[in-house]
Amino acid sequence: MTLALGSVAPAFSEQAPAPVLPGNAMPAPEVTLPMVAPAVNPMIIPGAPVRSVTLPFADVAPRPGAITLRGIQPNGQIEFGVRSDEVVTQATLNLEFTPSPSLIPVQSHLKVYLNDQLMGVEVIDKDQLGKKNHLQMTIDPRYVTDFNRIRLEFIGHYQNVCENPANTTLWLEIGKGSSLSLQYQKLPLSNDLAHFPVPFFDARDSRPLSLPMVFATSPDAGQQQAAAILASWFGTKAQWRGQSFPTLYNQLPDSHAVVFATNGKRPDFLNELPPVKGPVVQMISRPDNPYIKMLLILGRDDQDLLTAVKGIAQGNILFRGETIGVDKVDRILPRQPYDAPNWVRTDRPMNFGELKQYAEQLQSDGIQPNPITLNINLPPDLFLINSSGIDMRLKYRYTSPQLKNTSRLSISLNNQFVQDLTLKTGHDEDSQLLHLSLLQGLLDGSKDLNIPALKLGAVNQMRFDFDYTSLLASGTEGRCETYNTVPNHVVIDDSSTIDFSGYRHFMAMPDLRAFANAGFPFSRLADLSQTLLVVQPQPQPVQLTTLLDTMGNIGALTGYPALGVGLTEDAAKAKSTDADLLVIGNLPADLRDDSMRDEKKASLLIEAARDAVNTPVRQTSLPDNTAPASDARVDASAQISAQGPIAAVVGLQSPYFDQRSVVALMANGQQGFEMLNKSMQDSKQRAQVFGSVAVVRDSGVSSLKVGDTYYAGHLPWWERVWNALANHPVLLAVMAVIVVILAAILLWTGLRSLARRRLSDDDQE
C-alpha cells in the first residue's frame, strides 16, 4: 500500500494536567508515612468538558459482583481504564462490606491499594462485626494511569495465638452494591492520525463503542458499502465491548464521529473544505468544539470512499499527521474458509499460546491459585456428531504439593467437569522443563484427554483449577505450631495444544443462533467475500444503523473487516450472484409467499397493515433442543393486524443457490428498527435468537423453529447414510438384517455357481 502523508503534529497539547505515572512506574518511596498524602486534584483546564461516572462492582468486579475475602484468599480487585483524551480529577471508592462476627476488632482491618500504592486503611471495630457497613474513601487521582487496579487486602484475626488462616470464621464480604465514582475531564488533542484509532476508539475504554456516522443525505449503495466495511473494522477493535453506529444526515455530531463526503455530495458544515483529488482520510475538530473530533472519509466519488476505508482497515499502521492520501490498496492473497482470526484453526492443532488474550493469562499463584481460563471460539458448522471427542495435549507446571496424592488439577469446560489429574510430588518424564522453576521447585505433567460436547458457534471457556491441600497449622492442646505460608505457582504451558483438524463442515439450516453468535453463514469467509448485502434504496437513518451495527457485530465475532462484502439496492442482482444474502428491510418478492403456504419461503412477514407468521407442529423453547425436522413442519398460519412496533430476524434457504442462505432483518417502522438494534446489542436478548424466526417486541425476543430444513456444507454419501441411520436404531437394525440377508444370498449364489462349474468340468473329463 502507498500512502500520501500529511504534516505531523503532537497528539496532545502541551498544556496538560499534573503528570500521570506510566503503568509500570512506582512513585518515590515515602519512608516516614504509611500512605500517600491527601489527594490533590490535577489542574483543571478552564472550559474543558467534565463528566462523572459511577462504576458499580456488579459490572467491574468478577462475577457475580460480590467479593469474599478469606484468610487464605485475602485479596480482591477491580480494574478500570482511562481514555487517552481524558484525565481523572476526582475518585471516590464507595464500599459496602460485612465483616465476620468472629473477628478481633482493631487487629482486623481492610487495606485499599491503587496500582499497588496504599490509599487508606479501614480499621474494623466491634460495632461493625456481622453487620453491613458503608465506607467512602477518597482515591488520589494523581496515581491513576491508563490502566488501573484497585486491590482490597483483608487482614483478619480471630484469636491472638495459634491461628489457622484457613479457618472459616475469617471472612469479609464486599457487597455488589459497592461502586467507584470517577470524575473525568477532557484533554485537548491535536489532529494527529499517528494515534489512530484514538480518539474514535480507545482500547482503554471498556464501555460499548458508540461512533456516529454522518452523511450529507441518504447514501447510495457505494457509500453504504464503504460505511459497512468501516463499521466491521471498528467492530474488530471493539471486540467484547459491543458497538453501535448511530447514523446522521447532514448534522454535526455531538461526539467523536466519522463523516463520509464526496466532492459532489457533502454535509453543509464541510462546504468550505476544498475538493480532493483522490481518496483522503483527514482528522479535524468540530468547528465550535475542539474537544470533538471528526474522521473525514473523502473522495471524488464513491469508489474513492471504498479505497479510503480499505486503506484504514489495512494501512492504518502508517498513518500520521492530519491528512493522509490512500493511493491504492491491493489484496495479495484471498481469504480461506474458516480462517477468521477469532476462531480456532481447523487445519492443524493450535497452541494455547495462540489463544491467549493477554501475557499472563496461563499462570496463577497463591495459597489457592485462582482458576486459569482460556476462551475457545469454534465455527458453528463443525461436524462433531459421532465423534469420540477432541484431543488436547496438556502440559503444565506447578509448585510441588506438601502432601502426597491430595492436590489435583481439575479441568472444566463451560462449567461442566471434564477430568481431574493428580499433582504429583515427584518428577515425571517432562522434568526437563524445570528450568522455569519458581518457589519450592516446579514439576511438569503431561496428559492426554478427550473433551466432551462443545458449544459450536459460541464462546467456550476452558477452566483449569489447581486445588492444593496444604498443612497450615497443627499442634496439640497447649502446644501450637504455625507456618509461614508460601504461595503456590501454577502454569499451563503455551505449547499445550488442542486439535480440531480433520473434521468436516456440515450443519442443518436455518439456524439463527449461529447468525447471532457467530455471524454465520456470512462469516465462513472472514472478509465476507461470499456475502451480498441487499438494502433498501434511500434508507432511513435507523435502517442504515441496523446495517452498520450488524456489520460491526460480525467484525467483532470474526476479528477481520468485511473487505470483500458486496452491496446492492437491486434485489434482482441476487438471482445471478452466488452468495449468501443479508437483507435489511423488506423481503424481495422471490423470498416471500403472501399465502404463507410455501414452506421454502419466509415463515414470517412484517408489513405496515398486517403481519403473518407460520407456527410449527411442535415448538421448542430451548435453543439446544435437538428436535427432529418433522417437528418444524408448518402446522398453522396466522395473520394479525395490530399497532405498535415489531421487528424480526428470519432465516431461510436461498431460492437461487441450494448451498446459500438468506437472513433478513425486518421491522415495521423506525421504532421497530430501534428495538431490533437494541435487542441485537443485548447479550441476554441475543441469546434467545434461534431457529428460523425470531420476533422482537417490547416484551423481548421469541423464537420459532418452523419451515423447511436444509443442509449447508459437505458430507460424503456414506457419512450421510450413517448419520441418518444413527438416529433410528430400529431402522438401522432392519437395514443390518437386510444387508446380512443380501450378503448371504450373494454368497450362496456364488457358491452354487462355483459348484456347477466344477461339476461341469468333471462331466467333461
Where on the chain are the PLM-derived regions?
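Bacterial N-terminal signal peptides
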Residues: 1-7
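Sec/Tat signal peptide C-region and signal peptidase I cleavage site
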Residues: 8-13
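Solvent-exposed alpha-helical segments and adjacent loops
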Residues: 14-765
